Curated annotation (Swiss-Prot):
Keywords: Cytoplasm, Isomerase, Porphyrin biosynthesis, Pyridoxal phosphate
This protein's encoding gene: hemL
Gene3D superfamilies: Aspartate Aminotransferase, domain 1, Type I PLP-dependent aspartate aminotransferase-like (Major domain)
E.C. designation(s): 5.4.3.8
CDD domains on file: OAT_like
Organism: Thermomicrobium roseum (strain ATCC 27502 / DSM 5159 / P-2)
Protein name: Glutamate-1-semialdehyde 2,1-aminomutase
GO molecular function: glutamate-1-semialdehyde 2,1-aminomutase activity; pyridoxal phosphate binding; transaminase activity
Family: Belongs to the class-III pyridoxal-phosphate-dependent aminotransferase family. HemL subfamily.
Pfam families listed in its UniProt record: Aminotran_3 (PF00202)
Length: 430
């Protein structure tokens, strides 16, 4: 196949895909740029169709804990593909990955693999409604749980990036079954349970919000959710599609010491291949077909290639010192960015949990969707363009997380800090 350049590929893509892309944020519209057309990844670097190398902090939106094309993952995949690409039957590879997940994630006793994070949250919500006999689901403004109809109401990620209140096509009936509250607002949650507690099937939450930028939970917020759901007989669902195996082997629930009833996973557990999973207490998961009446199925669920890539990634994650190294590199990056912000005189903040972080152009820290929406998107766009011009690839939205991978090195962090110093100075000059 003759390789076209980025410009011609972008022209062709617009002929075939809505907006030229298969996921909206990839269009780079929020930063006023043409998209990066990726053809290859090597460690912490991504190479576009014109041969330009970018130091990558998108990392496939957090899926690439080990970086691009890690030799261990590639070797395992090369072996696996010789055995077949899909069976549609039980295989040892899904058993091995499930064993690793159950051994690592405190709240998961049984797990079901699906093909995406969206499928995971959709299936968890269905299960919660079935076992409680209730319809109402509580979510938080700015938290994104995939493109499930009922969870797109006041969502984060691309919905927030493009300034959309929700999306057409979601019926009023579906929206009525979703109660949207401010993230980190314990009082609002308490009021909701006081008024609607008997109708609430579940509360679904990103334990660390990653889709309005990185927003950590306020002290006591997650524990209060746990108390209120338990008292009301509702389920607590942690959407750990981003944080699962990103913040540690046990994810956010281990980091904060709060155990949900159900957990949704994705991204890292597929090692860069399509995957999702939901799991939780045995008594709940036993209600999923074929053991129970809650139906859910998928032709490619437990796909052997995804399972092998995920298991290879988790093998790397279990090596001694891995999460300590990620923490050290990300903290180093945060400190360097904060120093450059201070030098620039710009109103900006860096928020980080583990190896995920965001630089917000804001007068105050971001604690919820409302404060996220006050951020200066024009300044972020200028910053993004200046960083890209220096070969640093950031998410093309202020409301997406940056990710540090195992492939990033100290010299990469230093290079990023120096590039940010120049970019922020350029933004400050206007």
């Amino acid at each position: 196949m003759m390789m076209e350049n980025s410009g011609s590929l972008w022209d062709a893509a617009r002929q075939f895909f809505p907006g030229g892309v298969n996921s909206p944020v990839r269009a780079f519209r929020a930063v006023g740029e043409e998209p990066v057309v990726a053809v290859r990844g090597e460690g912490a670097y991504l190479i576009d169709a014109d041969g330009r190398r970018f130091l990558d902090y998108i990392c496939s939106w957090g899926a690439l804990l080990a970086g691009h094309a890690h030799p261990h993952v590639v070797d395992r995949l090369s072996e696996a593909i010789q055995r077949g690409t899909s069976f549609g039957l039980l295989s040892p590879y899904e058993v091995e990955l499930a064993r690793a997940i159950v051994a690592s994630v405190p709240a998961i006793e049984l797990v079901r693999f699906v093909n995406s994070g969206t499928e995971a949250t959709m299936s968890a919500i269905r299960l919660a409604r079935a076992v409680t006999g209730r319809n109402l689901v509580v979510k938080f403004a700015g938290c994104y749980h995939g493109h499930v109809d009922g969870l797109l109401v006041a969502a984060g990620s691309g919905v927030l990036t493009f300034g959309l209140p929700g999306t057409p096509g979601v019926t009023e009936g579906t929206a009525r079954d979703t109660l949207v509250l401010p993230y980190n607002d314990q009082e609002a949650v308490e009021d909701a349970f006081a008024q609607h507690g008997e109708r609430i099937a579940a509360v679904i939450v990103e334990p660390v919000a990653g889709n309005m930028g990185v927003v950590p939970p306020a002290a006591g917020f997650l524990s209060r959710l746990r108390e209120l759901t338990r008292q009301a007989g509702a389920l607590l669902i942690f959407d750990e599609v981003i944080t699962g195996f990103r913040l540690g082997l046990g994810g956010a629930q281990e980091r904060f010491g709060i155990l949900p009833d159900l957990t949704c996973l994705g991204k890292v557990i597929g090692g860069g291949l399509p995957v999702g999973a939901y799991g939780g207490r045995r008594d709940l998961m036993e209600q999923v077909a074929p053991n129970g009446p809650v139906y859910q199925a998928g032709t490619l669920a437990g796909n052997p290639l995804s399972m092998v890539a995920g298991l290879a990634t988790l093998e790397l994650a279990r090596e001694p010192g891995v999460y300590g190294r990620l923490e050290t590199l990300a903290a180093w990056l945060q400190r360097g960015l904060e120093e450059t912000i201070q030098e620039s005189g710009l109103p900006a903040h860096v928020q980080r949990v583990g190896s995920m972080l965001t630089l917000f152009f804001s007068q105050q820290p971001v604690t919820d969707a409302q404060t996220a929406e006050r951020c200066d998107t024009a300044r972020f766009a200028a910053f993004h363009r200046a960083m890209r011009a220096q070969g640093i690839l950031l998410p093309p939205s202020q409301f997406e997380a940056w990710f540090v991978s195992l492939a990033h090195r100290e010299e990469d962090i230093d290079r990023t800090i120096e590039a940010a110093r120049k970019a922020l100075a350029e933004v400050a000059r206007g």
